[in-house]
A protein has these predicted regions:
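C-terminal edge-of-domain segments
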Residues: 70-96
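Generic hydrophobic, helix-prone segments enriched in Leu/Val/Ile
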Residues: 21, 55-60, 85-87
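Short, hydrophobic/π-rich interface segment
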Residues: 45-71
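Actinobacteria-biased recognition of intrinsically disordered, low-complexity terminal regions
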Residues: 1-9, 96
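Contiguous, amphipathic alpha-helical segments that mediate oligomerization or scaffolding
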Residues: 6-37
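Short glycine-rich, basic-tinged beta-strand/loop micro-motifs
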Residues: 31-52
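Short interaction-hotspot residues at assembly and binding interfaces
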Residues: 2, 37-44, 73-77
Length: 96
């Protein structure tokens, strides 16, 4: 059992929403789209080493490395065209 928590949503609902958005934007070409949209999954843990372990687990599935941003923050991202999929580790004192 891990000491970290990965805050993610319902996979099927998320994918259905992406398909719905794609269909809507395709059917409505006058609707503006964001230049650099992103999706983020947060990793929570009380200490930096455990947070890093959670990040490594999530980043492995994406096939990307974890970047140590300093001060307890970690980042892993994969780009899909202009869209970023991020996993972010945030220190406990900065979580809201």
């Amino acid at each position: 059992m891990s000491d970290y928590t990965i805050r993610s949503g319902d996979r099927a609902v998320f994918l259905a929403g992406l398909r719905e958005l794609t269909d809507f934007l395709t059917a409505n070409p006058t609707v503006l789209v964001p230049r650099r949209p992103s999706f983020a999954v947060l990793v929570d843990a009380d200490d930096s080493d455990t947070r890093r372990a959670g990040m490594e687990s999530a980043a492995s599935a994406l096939g990307v490395p974890v970047a140590d941003l300093g001060m307890g923050y970690f980042d892993a991202r994969r780009e899909f065209g202009p869209i970023s999929y991020l996993v972010i580790g945030v220190p406990p004192e900065d979580r809201q």
